[in-house]
């Protein structure tokens, strides 16, 4: 029986999950909820379902896999990672995965705060000024390894790919100073299942954010 992934009909926090489902060849169905236009941004599609799914903490995204019902995007990724041995094999690898999971969320929040800001144009130059220092940390953490935890891919690579790709969409040249990050992106996109997924109609690279955002809402 396929699992069900519920989320808004955007990229958002669902992107890394969709990529991981595809990579692991997990049979899944999507419930994509649409949000209405301004000024009301009607959420009734989701609200009509929200308290009918028996979720402990009703929220989007959610994953339903038989009797297992998981919310919180990183918890979903960890759940899938455990099922498919993609959480790191050594203690050092698991530590690196733990660090990346939290670091990516920090990076994601910083970009989201900018893109949802009414002062987007005013704040954008400062964000771009600090971006190389942020990306340098990822570059140094990756080093010469093929994947962020080591020689084998983990669910953390799906998170890092997602957030780096969002930044590349925002500022196309931002990775040019970091050849190892560019190689990582190409390596990830070259994975057989990922490459195939990106050619399908299921692939949803945008909109990155919901309709209230100033950037990434289309």
UniProtKB/Swiss-Prot annotation:
Domain called GST N-terminal: residue spans: 1-88
The protein's role, per its UniProt record: Conjugation of reduced glutathione to a wide number of exogenous and endogenous hydrophobic electrophiles.
Name of the molecule in the record: Glutathione S-transferase Mu 6
Residues that coordinate or bind substrate: 116
Gene3D superfamilies reported for this sequence: 1.20.1050.10, Glutaredoxin (3.40.30.10)
Keyword Transferase: yes
Domain GST C-terminal: 90-208
Residues the record lists as binding glutathione: 7-8, 46-50, 59-60, 72-73
Family annotation (CDD domains): GST_C_Mu, GST_N_Mu
GO CC entries: cytoplasm
E.C. designation(s): 2.5.1.18
Database matches in InterPro entries: Glutathione-S-Trfase_C-like, Glutathione-S-Trfase_C_sf, Glutathione_S-Trfase_N, GST_C, GST_mu, GST_superfamily, Thioredoxin-like_sf
Superkingdom of origin: Eukaryota
SUBUNIT field: Homodimer.
Reaction catalyzed: RX + glutathione = an S-substituted glutathione + a halide anion + H(+)
Family: Belongs to the GST superfamily. Mu family.
Key words of the record: Cytoplasm, Transferase
Tissues expressing the protein: Expressed in liver, stomach and small intestine. Not expressed in spleen, kidney, colon, heart, muscle, brain or lung.
Record keyword Transferase present: yes
One example GO MF annotation: glutathione transferase activity
Compartmental location: Cytoplasm
